[in-house]
Amino acid sequence: MPPAPPDQKPCHLQPAPYRALSETILFGSLNEERWWHSTAPILSRLLISSNYDVDVQYKYLSLYRHLVLPALGPYPQRDPETGIIATQWRSGMVLTGLPIEFSNNVARALIRIGVDPVTADSGTAQDPFNTARPKGYLETAARLLPGVDLTRFYEFETELVITKEEEAVLQANPDLFKSPWKSQILTAMDLQKSGTVLVKAYFYPQPKSAVTGRSTEELLVNAIRKVDRESRFETQLANLERYMERRRRGLHVPVVTADKPPPTEADKTFDACSFFPHFLSTDLVEPGKSRVKFYASERHVNLKMVEDIWTFGGLRRDPDALKGLELLRHFWADIQMREGYYTMPRGFCELGKSSAGFEAPMMFHFHLDGSQSPFPDPQMYVCVFGMNSRKLVEGLTTFYRRLGWEDMASHYQGNFLANYPDEDFEKAAHLCAYVSFAYKDGGAYVTLYNHSFNPLGDVALAN
């Protein structure tokens, strides 16, 4: 049965829960206080516009204050010469390098908090790959939140995260890993309307690949099989492996031409095939109920490639897959998605840099859920960072109306604008980084991964 049209309510520039809590919070540091006022208003508006009960809004803002704020590390600084606003540690979660991102599953009107937990040592010689802090953050989350089980985290950490000895090798041999994207563990919390929280961990094994000489695909696939002792995921994983092998035999990176740039240092950490394994995520719940999502990226960004990946080269053609593909084509057209051959970015696009024209590959995740379906359900993520934010929101509004989501179509643009009162909406191209599309349970699912930070005071961007 298709999901009901999502809730969406208009929200105010200064949401009441944020204002009320701000009057009573004793912050642990100036960093925490500044992070709060730069990010919490956005989270509060998202919870209001998505129609969370008031008591649940206060619960999640309190959780944000006590768990997340201490994990965001030093507040960003503005370089007086360049005007660039950045943190010491550049997080691979966000193209601006910031360690926080709110995402909005508009189909279910659910909000997610993405966090790259850091300390003042992250990115320094003391902790060049930010290896230690994410574990401590998740262990704190497990003490605070019922139902969090870290078994899967510890298992994947052992397989995919560098050891102290491997870290020393990478430090002594900097040419082994020259990519600016160094995050190994990211985290997320799905904020359910009921007040329960689903915690997830994401593992990026590129540093491990560089120091061991094993490919990203080998590390990811072997890790999944090692933790999947009951072979719940085997059929779906084997079909995904066969598709990746078919792609390796066929579509390789084309000869470089004027419009196909050479590989960046980040590109060199991945497979040369345009479709390359990237990372995985897992639910931090009881292992028998935990799902795994396998993420891969695609440098050829066009509808023909989307259709090939969506159908596993034409093998996945059940009615839901074909209906989803039909809607995906409308989605692509409505947002006027750009097409081309896009390498991994050379570096981050920190605040203060021009984001117009910034490009990156698209991504897909493949949902290994242990169901009877022989193919894992795909979800597409297109990078819209660098595209005009106003035109993107207008395109999304068109798509919402196509789906019959009238509440969302009526209020989405106004609510989006309220989060960025100091931005020039006509020129901004960084307010949304990715948009994802999936089709399940007879309906479309769209999630927005939005800019989640407004700088304060002397750090604010000059007009």
UniProtKB/Swiss-Prot annotation:
Dimethylallyl diphosphate binds at R112, K200, Y202, K293, Y295, Q379, Y381, Y445, Y449. Coiled coil: none annotated. It comes from the Eukaryota. Pfam families: Trp_DMAT (PF11991). It catalyses: brevianamide F + dimethylallyl diphosphate = tryprostatin B + diphosphate. The record marks G114 as: Required for regioselectivity. One of its GO terms (molecular function) is prenyltransferase activity. Brevianamide F binds at M93, E101, Y204. Pathway: Mycotoxin biosynthesis. Keywords: Alkaloid metabolism, Prenyltransferase, Transferase. Its EC number is 2.5.1.106. GO terms for biological process: alkaloid metabolic process. Brevianamide F prenyltransferase; part of the gene cluster that mediates the biosynthesis of fumitremorgins, indole alkaloids that carry not only intriguing chemical structures, but also interesting biological and pharmacological activities. The biosynthesis of fumitremorgin-type alkaloids begins by condensation of the two amino acids L-tryptophan and L-proline to brevianamide F, catalyzed by the non-ribosomal peptide synthetase ftmPS/ftmA. Belongs to the tryptophan dimethylallyltransferase family. This is Tryprostatin B synthase. It comes from Neosartorya fischeri (strain ATCC 1020 / DSM 3700 / CBS 544.65 / FGSC A1164 / JCM 1740 / NRRL 181 / WB 181). The lineage of its organism: Eukaryota, Fungi, Dikarya, Ascomycota, Pezizomycotina. The gene is ftmPT1.
